[in-house]
């Protein structure tokens, strides 16, 4: 394979992995530990 193809595939895999981890952190099991500042604020 050419170098440009390998670099493109590597960057694409990193981007997909980072996006998947961000979605898992936002909506998955770790999201239970996140606090909601709007719920903490009293009107």
Swiss-Prot record:
Specify the domain of life of the species encoding this protein.
Answer: Eukaryota
Cross-referenced InterPro entries: PSII_PsbN
Q: Which residues cross the membrane?
A: 5-27
Which Gene Ontology terms describe the biological processes this protein takes part in? Answer: photosynthesis
Listed A to Z, the keywords are: Chloroplast, Membrane, Plastid, Thylakoid, Transmembrane, Transmembrane helix
Q: What GO cellular component is one of the record's annotations?
A: chloroplast thylakoid membrane
Annotated PANTHER family: PROTEIN PSBN
Q: What does this protein do?
A: May play a role in photosystem I and II biogenesis.
Family affiliation: Belongs to the PsbN family.
Descriptive protein name: Protein PsbN
Q: Which organism does this sequence originate in?
A: Welwitschia mirabilis
Gene name, please? psbN
């Amino acid at each position: 394979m050419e170098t440009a193809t390998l670099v493109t595939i590597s960057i694409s895999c990193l981007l997909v992995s980072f996006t998947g981890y961000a979605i898992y952190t936002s909506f998955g099991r770790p999201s239970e530990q996140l606090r909601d500042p709007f719920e903490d604020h009293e009107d």
